[in-house]
Amino acid sequence: MPARCWLCPSFCALTGKGVVVMLRAIRKPIRHKHKMTDQTAAPRDMANAIRALAMDAVQLADSGHPGMPMGMADVATVLFSKFLKFDASEPNWPDRDRFILSAGHGSMLLYSLLHLTGYADMTLDELKKFRQLGARTAGHPEYGHASGIETTTGPLGQGLGNSVGFALAERILAERFGRDVVDHYTYVIAGDGCLMEGVGQEAITLAGHLGLGRLIVLFDDNGISIDGPTSLSTSEDHKKRFAAAGWHVQAVDGHDAEAVTRAIRKARNVTDKPSLIACKTVIGYGAPTKAGTAATHGSPLGKDEIAGARAKLGWNHEPFDIPEAVFSAWRKIGARGKSARRKWTKNLAAMGPEDRAEFDRRQKGDIPPAVDEAIAAFKAKLAAEKPSWATRKSSQEALEVINPVLPDTVGGSADLTGSNNTKTATLKGASRADTAGRYIYYGIREHAMAAAMNGMALHGGIIPYGGTFMVFTDYCRPSIRLSALMGVRVIYVMTHDSIGLGEDGPTHQPVEHLPALRAIPNLQVLRPADAIETAECWQIALEAKHVPSVLALTRQNLPTVRGAGDENLCAKGAYILAGEETAPIRLIASGSEVQLALAARDLLAKDGLAAAVVSMPSWELFAAQEDTYRNKVMGGDGTVRVACEAATGFGWERWLGSKGAFVGMKGFGASAKAPELYKHFGITAEAIAQAARRLAQ
């Protein structure tokens, strides 16, 4: 006889040994539709395999988040078994659907799916090493640790922001190469936390505005946060919120496989707007005393609770043991995409030779020779004309020669296009009407811009760059950090890089931002001194496949301080711009302060003191050079070194040695014209020269 549900008066026909039901405030019962046997693998059995692996791995690690994987197992089973286009044997197939676990704390959901569907590097041993040093199964999913992990998530909302970039990249590439080779969806599992985060709201409104019809978000609507019920901190109606942002919205019982199937099918047919499917779920589904509570969010369930969950779920198997019928069914799902991939391969082979060559090149991330040729010609022109441009203007002029020969680039700005100089003549704005546009008007959404650029870079075939004022790197720093952590080619065009921006004052003058950005590992900060260096810095950023770049650019005009030459001198991070290698004094500067160092050298020459000026656009690149080169540029230990930068001096001691001084900012800026500010704060050629004189005595 069927057993009585543990929280409702109705009978469920799952098994006579025990059942599990939805735990909601209204205590609505779940109506099970599948009987569990040893011979068949019903959807509920397959979902329970995910639940069991999540419980077991978290318990073994004595750390982790079992609640979300248990709650979203039914939804994930439907998605992977009926809709997601992938081939586990070819995880990097360019036309696969992208699955993003924005709620990255539920990483065992993803790891379980990757193991069950047959990704070669996600073995059972890896699941057993969950959260251990050196394992592919880190606490939160990390891009590059294992196949099938499309992006690094964990900081909530980032995956949702990434998804906008994934969907944009798919749409732009489909316009270029056609639906025969680019025809996939982006699916996201997001939780309450993702929707509470500011980056989540920015991403939601941007996706709705752009009409990203192949973006489908599955919202784990479990009503629980770490502190307890979400009613403690929020009372908004997410469904109305998404609808107001231009999304197609549905709500379903997340434990009703048929309802979830219908909803995803309907969402896939909505082509003019992104889709939200709010899946009402029970966090920790199946746990006899903890389901539906915050206790399942971020702690192991405990042996007794797991035993009870096994009984409730009818899962009478040892830890990490998956019945053959269930395992076989999952492996068939992992191989189901082979036929679609083979058809795609034929379509790819049928492309014209030029289109095929470009598609392959862009997937590899290679830069065509035409870019180097264009930059070389541009540098020669600059050397002849010697313009006095702000480096933001120099950046735009560099892009004017790069973008026509590099179709990979997708530019944008956070409502500062005219100030960042990020749009060029050949780029059209992306919109619902123009889905081929390579320029994104992000609006005042700096965080979503950065997160979306990460998504575009991760998708492949796109090199994204986007601009805002440098002070607003604070608004997108979490995504910049993830760019560096993942090692993706994203180019941040950050203008108005110092007190040189002038009258807007200290709220807009970045003084601590250069050291703060330099503190991020695997991020190269490039601060060019003139138009030629700016062109070289763009070349460096484009060639760095696995390193994101920040271009720190001026508002104020700067003179051309060097000739062209074939060699990219900025590529070594620092070089002697003027003077002799044997000079006993080094005047070191970056960006707009290089001209001050050159003027200070002239002042010292009048005193009979020989100095060499070092232009240092990138600390990171210079640090990567051999000791012999660094010593050549900086001089020996006894060399007098004076550094100048219109920023705080944090970190400069690394380069100054025993006889060094720094000329720069000691606090926040002020509102006035740039020349007046430089004089007011003592950032002058005379101040540099005086520091050198003092140290040379």
Where in the sequence are the language-model features?
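Non-catalytic terminal/interface segments that mediate subunit docking, oligomerization
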Residues: 348-489, 567-575, 581-583, 588-591, ...
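A glycine-rich helix N-cap at a beta->alpha junction
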Residues: 119-129, 207-217, 244-245, 484-497, ...
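Acidic-glycine-rich active-site phosphate/pyrophosphate-binding loop
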Residues: 40-51, 84-86, 123-145, 417-431, ...
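Thiamine diphosphate
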Residues: 132-144, 168, 172-183, 200-321, ...
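A short, small-residue-rich loop immediately preceding and capping a beta-strand
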Residues: 61, 97-98, 149-152, 179-197, ...
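Cofactor-binding active-site loop characterized by glycine-rich and histidine/acidic residues
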Residues: 72-210, 423-424, 456
